[in-house]
């Protein structure tokens, strides 16, 4: 993959583990963004030692703004995200999960909001929940029904709070957001620009583990 030519404004973080089935859709949604040039954003994809055909899928992508890294061993999601953030160039950072995808104006509108609203240190967008076949299920308010992704942060503010906590194997995004909001403001874009895929292998369907980490989160 070629090196990016200019310093991008936005770094998109994708961490993937055995999501070869979904990763192409995710990347194509990000590589076909409107109203923003490719050199104005980068995509950092960290594969957490997948055992499926993820690497084979990625060989089809030669875009100048896509950087791919493979962990030598499985590090887990929080450590992989932190690794990507530390390698990022952009002043804004946003996480997109590898089984999800975004609207074509997602990056443009997120950047525009932060450029115009200096009092906010991040912006969250509403999301549409979709099924395996991308059939619409529901429109969700990201401030009331929070998910870990689709929030664009000013990067220095993420470093200010210490990035993701590796002890949270689930609900890591909610834990980060809780710490972030103690010091910083998150704005709200009432547009379903993020597409959250609800499928049979989705991590958030493991209710037993969710309850464990929710209890841990509530103690903080």
Question: Residues of each region from the PLM?
Answer:
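A conserved hydrophobic helix/loop-capping motif in glycosyltransferases and polysaccharide synthases
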Residues: 10-22, 26, 33, 46
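Short, acidic, metal-binding catalytic loop of nucleotide-sugar glycosyltransferases
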Residues: 28-40
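A conserved acidic beta->alpha catalytic loop
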Residues: 29, 47-56, 73, 97
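Glycine-rich, basic loop-to-helix element that forms the pyrophosphate-binding segment
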Residues: 71-88
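Short aromatic/hydrophobic "clamp" motif used to bind/position activated sugar donors
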Residues: 93
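Conserved donor NDP-sugar-binding/catalytic core segment of glycosyltransferases
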Residues: 105-137
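Acidic donor-binding loop at a coil-to-helix junction in glycosyltransferase catalytic cores
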Residues: 170-176
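Catalytic core of nucleotide-sugar-dependent glycosyltransferases
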Residues: 196-199, 205-220
């Amino acid at each position: 993959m070629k090196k990016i030519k200019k310093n991008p404004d936005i770094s998109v973080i994708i961490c993937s583990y055995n999501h070869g089935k979904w990763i192409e859709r995710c990347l194509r949604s990000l590589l076909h963004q409107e109203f923003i040039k490719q050199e104005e954003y980068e995509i950092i994809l960290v594969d957490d030692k997948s055992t499926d055909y993820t690497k084979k899928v990625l060989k089809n992508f030669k875009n100048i703004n896509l950087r791919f890294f493979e962990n030598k061993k499985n590090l887990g999601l929080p450590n992989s995200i932190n690794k990507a953030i530390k390698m990022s160039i952009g002043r804004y950072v946003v996480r997109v999960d590898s089984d999800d995808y975004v609207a074509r104006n997602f990056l443009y509108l997120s950047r525009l909001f932060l450029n115009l609203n200096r009092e906010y240190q991040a912006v969250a967008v509403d999301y549409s929940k979709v099924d395996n076949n991308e059939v619409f299920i529901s429109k969700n308010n990201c401030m009331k029904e929070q998910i870990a992704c689709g929030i664009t942060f000013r990067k220095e503010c993420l470093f200010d709070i210490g990035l993701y906590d590796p002890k949270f194997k689930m609900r890591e995004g909610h834990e980060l957001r809780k710490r972030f909001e103690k010091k910083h403001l998150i704005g709200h874009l009432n547009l379903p620009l993020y597409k959250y895929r609800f499928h049979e292998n989705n991590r958030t369907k493991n209710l037993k583990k969710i309850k464990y980490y929710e209890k841990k989160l509530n103690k903080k």
